[in-house]
C-alpha cells in the first residue's frame, strides 16, 4: 500500500511543470533600463537620469553589429526640440558613461519614478517608440550621471 501511494504521488507531481511556461525562457532587461533592437543597432540598459529641474541625461550602451558608422536619432516625445543624433561606430558605444557620449536634453521636464516616451531610429530602418524609466541620483550608482543644470542666463543692463 505504501509503495502504491508513493508511486501515485510521484506520478501525480512529476508533470506539474509541463503546462507552466518556464520563466528562464522569457527575454527581459535584467536591469533598471530597457533594451531596443533596430536593424544592426542594439541599445542596452537605456535609462534617463534627471536632476531637480527635469533635465534628462540618457545613459546606456549601443552595440553596432554592422560594419559602418551610423547616426542614431533619439527624440524625447512630448517636448519641443528635445532630440539629438549620436554617432555609433561598429562595436560598442557607451552613452553618457565615462564622458564617451554625454547626452543631455535640457528643459525636458522629466520626473523621477515615471517613464518618458523616447523615439529611437537610424538610417532607413523603422524607428521604435519605447517607454524609458526616469531615475534620479538618489541611488549611489546613478549619482555620477545626474546632469548639471545650465547656468542662469546672463543679462546685460545698458
Per-range role (PLM):
Residues 11-15:
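C-terminal motif of bacterial Sec signal peptides marking the signal peptidase cleavage site
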Residues 17-20:
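Bacterial signal peptide processing site
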Residues 23-36, 129, 134-158:
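Extracytoplasmic/periplasmic copper-protein system
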Residues 36-49:
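N-terminal edge beta-strand
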Residues 47-71:
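Short, surface-exposed binding/anchoring microloops in extracellular/periplasmic proteins
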Residues 53-59, 109-117:
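Short, solvent-exposed loop/turn segments enriched in Ser/Thr/Gly
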Residues 67-81:
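Short acidic, flexible loop segments centered on an aromatic residue
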Residues 77-107:
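Intrinsically disordered, low-complexity Pro/Gly/Ser/Thr-rich segments with frequent PxxP/GP/PP motifs
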Amino acid at each position: 500500500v505504501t509503495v502504491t501511494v508513493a508511486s501515485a504521488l510521484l506520478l501525480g507531481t512529476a508533470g506539474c511543470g509541463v503546462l507552466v511556461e518556464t520563466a528562464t525562457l522569457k527575454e527581459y532587461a535584467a536591469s533598471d533600463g530597457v533594451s531596443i533592437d533596430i536593424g544592426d543597432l542594439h541599445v542596452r540598459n537605456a535609462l534617463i537620469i534627471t536632476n531637480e529641474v527635469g533635465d534628462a541625461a540618457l545613459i546606456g550602451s549601443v552595440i553596432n553589429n554592422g560594419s559602418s558608422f551610423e547616426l542614431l536619432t533619439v527624440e524625447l516625445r512630448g517636448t519641443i526640440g528635445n532630440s539629438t543624433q549620436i554617432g555609433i561606430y561598429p562595436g560598442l558605444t557607451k552613452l553618457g558613461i565615462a564622458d564617451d557620449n554625454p547626452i543631455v536634453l535640457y528643459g525636458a521636464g522629466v520626473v523621477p519614478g515615471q517613464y518618458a516616451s523616447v523615439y529611437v531610429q537610424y538610417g532607413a530602418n523603422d524607428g521604435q517608440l519605447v517607454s524609458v524609466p526616469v531615475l534620479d541620483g538618489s541611488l549611489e550608482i546613478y549619482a555620477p550621471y545626474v546632469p548639471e543644470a545650465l547656468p542662469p542666463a546672463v543679462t546685460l543692463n545698458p
